[in-house]
Structures are given as C-alpha cells and as structure tokens.
Amino acid sequence: MSQPEQCWYIRTPIQQGEIFSSWLIRSALDVGCSPMVLIEALWGKWRALTIDLDKGVDAERFDALLSHSMESKQKIQQSMLSSVVSQIQPNYDSNQNIPWVLSLGTRNRSNTSGRQVCVECLKSHENPPYLRLMWRIGWHCSCVEHQLSLIDHCPECGVTIQPFKADMEHGCLAICTTCGFDLRRCEESKNINLNALNFQNKAEQVLKQKIGFYNQSPVTTQVWFEIARSWLSEIRFLVN
C-alpha cells in the first residue's frame, strides 16, 4: 500500500512590500532549515538559488508552491518583480535583463550586486528583518522613511549582501552571511544625493498614478520611463 503524500505548509506571512526571495528565505529559517533544503522540498533538484528567483517561476512550480503555502496566489505574485516591471515594460520577459531592475550578477548562490538594504528598516521591532521589493529597482537609492542611503555591501567585510547563503547560524536576514556582522549595527549613512532622491520620488509618483508628464504633456507610465532612460543614458555619455 502506497504511503500518502505528507502535507506541510509554509506558514510565514509575506510582509508589507516584501520581495519573493526574502519570503522564501525567511520561511526556510522559520521551519528550521536552510533555503536550499526548502527549495529542494518544493521543487526537487532544480537549482533555483542560482538564478534570479524574484523574476518569477513557471506555472508548474508556482502551483507546487501554492499547494504548500498559506499565502494567497495574488499576494505571492505581488512579491515578484513582475508586479512593478509589467507597468513600465508590458512585454515583460523574465529570461532577459529587465530595464530598471538591478542585476544580481548571480553565480551559484552568490551575487555580485543588486541587493540593497536600509539598515534602519532592518531594525524594526514590529516585523522581522526582510528585504523590500523596491530595493531591487534601479531608481531606489535611499529610504524615504528614514532619510538614509541604501547599502549593498557589508560595512564590516566589504562583501556584497548575499541573502541566499543565509542559514540557521545566521538566524535572520540582517546578518552578513560572509562575516556574521549584524547589519542593524551599521552606522547610518545620511549622505543622500538630493538629485537622485528627487528622481526617485518622481518615479514613484509616476508609477503610483500610472501617468507622467513630459514637456507639460501627459504620457503613459511606459513612455515616461523610456524617456527617463534616454536622458540618463545621455547624461552618462556626457559625464564619461
């Protein structure tokens, strides 16, 4: 007689504005295992931690995740980059580099860039430390709430933030997985670039209102961001 399939569930709730990979990592730590073990339980030998999971998974793997999750389909989808990128690039292709999304430079479980954090956000007493979706977006350089610059590397050892290497010994996403430094102890950097912050605020406004303005004329969100990219490319060319 065959044994019935064991039922188990991810009970960790997705936090406000949390990104998909952060939720999976915290879910693994909450049940007492590494992200690698949880990923294998969900999807077998698929090397999910060697890619940019925040871009999403295919329908079959998404269904497998839903069958073991207490979260709704909509809430999980909202934690993926597609929930933002689809507004500025309708022909969204998760297999390609996406404009405005910081590339992780992934190799095995390591990433050479793309993970930014606000150290004050990690200190919240109301929620466990978690990574925000908007920290992966290219125009985000500062935390508006705390008026701090985001950091993308450990101030102690200088290595880029590597959340996929989190394990039980680290306990949460606020710990550098390379040297063990608690990022919540980092001295805040208040040296904010005001021009960059102004652009960040304007981009957020366009994204929220789903309309922008160029030369005093209304344009779609997609067109506004295309124009912004063109101007930024021109500025970089002139500076270099």
Locate each region found by the language model.
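Short alpha-helical "patches" and their helix-cap loops
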Residues: 37-45, 135, 157-163
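A structured, charge-rich N-terminal accessory region that forms the first stable segment of a protein
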Residues: 1-114, 119-125, 129, 198-199, ...
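A structural signal for short, well-ordered beta-strand segments and their strand-loop junctions
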Residues: 38-39, 117-120, 142-144, 153-156
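Residues immediately within or flanking Cys/His clusters that coordinate Zn2+
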Residues: 115-118, 137-140, 151, 173
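Aromatic-residue detector
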Residues: 25, 37-38, 131, 138-139, ...
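Catalytic micro-motifs at enzyme active sites that drive phosphoryl/nucleotidyl and oxygen chemistry
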Residues: 104-108, 126-134, 139-144, 162-166
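Domain-exit/linker segments immediately C-terminal to small folded modules
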Residues: 144, 148-240
